[in-house]
């Protein structure tokens, strides 16, 4: 059996059994015949009717009679499979069958997805993100695109179709007049969705620099949860009791626990210093609980190049490069953070569990949704002269028809 294929299966934590040198069984999915594409000039061929077919050296009917319905092959750097019972289609060999059991099995929801609607930064369709979420046994999925709500309606539709809960999130930058602070907003109710739309307007319509003023942000907190970014701890320490203004405005407040590793040491130091400040001065107060949100821009570790390429297209250079901003399972999250804490000073397991529980808390409270059962038109705002002439929009409409 090809060692590269076995490494691929191990890296993707898939359960499998080797039947013989050409056949492998993915537990919970089925048997696959290994096609060595290095032995052929092209993976495609045409049949007698000029239809394009997969160029397999094996007789498909014979494979099916032996209970082998899939052909697995390498194309480029990835491994794909083909269901011989259907028309040929590339299917990447991921998120199928049974996954190797995790050591950490508590409930957790990924709230850090950045979709392709965050242009030239996030990647992969929402269908792919949802597929991996379900493969990992997660019951909900949250997005947090920066300065855009473009993916929210599609998220709702895709999650409804897949039978999981959705969480509308939004990443932004606000200012107190001196400092600029990053945060995430997560909708909890219909009121929260309306307020998030108002926040979106403040940023993308009213603001010249796409940053919202703190006073405007606090006006639209009802029905929403705010999560302060991993870099915000120094500012949070400085404002002290003024944090109460956020609790008065928002339904709840959290601190983003994200210890993803970057390629540049200076960025890692910045993250670690900010996280240390949070645990030294804020964590023990219990006022601002941690929530485990890793900003995810690509599905798997081997997809990290996506963000680099997209950033170079957008700005000519890729800043804050990382191979660690992918959709992790809980064991991978644990491995990222456990080695960074002094086990004699901190109860790491307790911190980890609390941060995971808070992702579930946010997801369970997320009831905001778009009404898609009816069609709506934009509301017309009457000008002052129209208001003086007509009692309401309907009267104006009828008069204009005449």
Go through each PLM region and give its residues.
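Non-catalytic structural connector segments
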Residues: 103-107, 347-402
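A residue-level signal for conserved active-site and pocket-lining positions in enzyme catalytic cores
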Residues: 9, 16-17, 63, 71, ...
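Phosphate/diphosphate-binding loops
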Residues: 167-170, 298-299, 303, 311-368
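Acidic, low-complexity, intrinsically disordered interaction modules
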Residues: 43, 68-72, 79
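Short acidic, glycine/proline-enriched helix-loop-strand junctions
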Residues: 79-93, 153-167
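Domain-core and long-helix interface of multi-subunit machines
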Residues: 77, 100-162, 198-304, 308, ...
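Mobile, glycine- and charge-enriched loop segments
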Residues: 21-31, 36-50, 89-121
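Short nucleic-acid-contacting surface segments enriched for D/E, G, S/T with interspersed K/R
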Residues: 57-62
């Amino acid at each position: 059996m090809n060692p590269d294929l076995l490494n691929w299966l191990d890296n993707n934590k898939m359960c499998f059994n080797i039947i013989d040198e050409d056949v492998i069984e993915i537990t919970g999915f089925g048997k696959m015949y290994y096609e060595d594409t290095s032995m052929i000039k092209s993976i495609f061929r045409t049949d007698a009717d000029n239809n394009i077919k997969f160029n397999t050296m094996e007789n498909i009917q014979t494979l099916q009679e032996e209970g082998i319905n899939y052909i697995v092959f390498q194309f480029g750097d990835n491994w794909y499979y083909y269901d011989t019972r259907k028309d040929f289609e590339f299917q990447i060999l991921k998120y199928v069958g049974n996954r190797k059991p995790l050591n950490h099995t508590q409930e957790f929801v990924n709230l850090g997805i950045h979709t392709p609607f965050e242009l030239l930064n996030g990647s992969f369709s929402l269908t792919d993100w949802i597929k991996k979420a379900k493969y990992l046994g997660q019951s909900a999925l949250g997005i947090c695109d920066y300065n855009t709500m473009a993916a929210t309606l599609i998220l709702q539709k895709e999650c409804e179709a897949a039978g999981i809960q959705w969480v509308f999130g939004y990443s932004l930058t606000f200012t107190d007049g001196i400092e600029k602070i990053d945060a995430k907003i997560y909708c909890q109710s219909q009121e929260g969705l309306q307020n998030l739309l108002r926040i979106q307007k403040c940023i993308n319509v009213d603001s010249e620099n796409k940053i919202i003023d703190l006073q405007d942000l606090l006006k639209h907190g009802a029905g929403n949860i705010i999560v302060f970014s991993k870099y915000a701890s120094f500012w949070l320490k400085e404002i002290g009791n003024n944090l109460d203004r956020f609790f008065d405005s928002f339904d709840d407040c959290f601190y983003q626990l994200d210890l993803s590793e970057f390629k540049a040491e200076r960025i890692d130091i910045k993250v670690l210093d900010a996280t240390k400040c949070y645990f030294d001065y804020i964590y023990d107060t219990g006022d601002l609980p941690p929530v485990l949100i890793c900003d995810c821009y690509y599905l798997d570790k081997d997809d990290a190049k996506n963000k680099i390429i997209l950033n170079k297209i957008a700005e000519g250079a890729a800043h804050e490069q990382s191979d660690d901003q992918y959709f992790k399972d809980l064991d991978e999250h644990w491995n990222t953070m456990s080695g960074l804490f002094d086990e004699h000073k901190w109860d790491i397991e307790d911190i980890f569990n609390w941060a995971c529980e808070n992702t579930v808390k946010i997801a369970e409270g997320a009831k905001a949704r778009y009404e898609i059962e009816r069609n709506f038109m934009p509301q017309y705002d009457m000008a002052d002269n129209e208001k003086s002439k007509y009692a309401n929009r309907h009267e104006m409409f009828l008069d204009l028809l005449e």
